[in-house]
A protein has these predicted regions:
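Active-site-proximal binding-pocket segments
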Residues: 1-8
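Cell-envelope/ECM-targeting effectors and their regulatory/trafficking segments
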Residues: 8, 14-168
Length: 168
C-alpha cells in the first residue's frame, strides 16, 4: 500500500478535517471533491479503506491523502515533514516521480515562541492544539482553521504573522 497521494482540496472543504483521527473512506473524500493533483485515478486497492487528510502548510502548500503507512514512517520520527520526505524519496526511486506539483508558499518567519503564544491563546479558548510547544502540528493547524471559521475568516490552518497579531 502506498504512503499517500498529493491531492487538490477544494476551498469548500475545511482544512480542519486534517488529522489521523479523522480518517474517511476514499469515496467520501472524492464526494467532497478531492482529486489527485496528478490527474491519475487513485489505485483500486485504496477503495473502501481509510485515508487521512494532511496539510502540513495549511492552505499554503501541498495537501495529501495519506494511508496508515504514512504513520508507520512517523513511528521513527514524529515530524510530518520527515515522513513526507521519506515517502516522496521512495516514490522518486520506485516510480521516477518528480517534485510535488503544488508549490510550498512563503510561510513567514514566526518563531517557536510566537507559535506557542498562539497555541496558548487557542487553548484558553478551548481548542486542543496538542500542547503549546511552538510546533504547528496537525492539532494546532486544525485548531487555527476552526478558530478562523468561527471568526468568519478564510481558513488557512496555518500560523501567520497577521494571525499572531490577532490571536493573543
Amino acid at each position: 500500500r502506498d504512503w499517500g497521494f498529493e491531492v487538490a482540496v477544494p476551498e469548500a472543504v475545511s482544512c480542519a478535517l486534517e488529522g489521523p483521527d479523522q480518517g474517511r473512506k476514499l469515496a467520501e473524500w472524492q464526494a467532497m471533491g478531492l482529486t489527485r493533483i496528478s490527474g491519475k485515478a487513485f489505485p483500486a486497492n485504496e477503495n473502501g479503506k481509510d485515508l487521512f487528510l494532511l496539510m502540513p502548510a495549511g492552505r499554503y502548500g501541498p495537501a495529501f491523502l495519506v494511508t496508515p503507512n504514512f504513520y508507520v514512517l512517523k513511528a521513527y520520527n514524529m515530524s510530518d515533514l520527515y515522513a513526507l520526505f521519506i515517502g516522496h524519496v521512495s516514490d522518486r526511486i520506485a516510480y521516477g516521480s518528480g517534485d510535488f506539483i503544488t508549490a510550498w508558499g512563503a510561510l513567514g518567519s514566526l518563531t517557536r515562541g510566537d507559535i506557542a503564544r498562539m497555541q496558548r491563546a487557542l487553548e484558553a479558548q478551548g481548542h486542543d492544539v496538542g500542547g503549546a510547544d511552538g510546533l504547528p502540528g496537525y492539532k494546532t493547524r486544525r485548531s487555527i482553521g476552526r478558530w478562523q471559521d468561527a471568526q468568519s475568516q478564510p481558513s488557512t490552518c496555518f500560523p501567520t504573522s497577521p494571525l499572531k497579531a490577532t490571536l493573543r
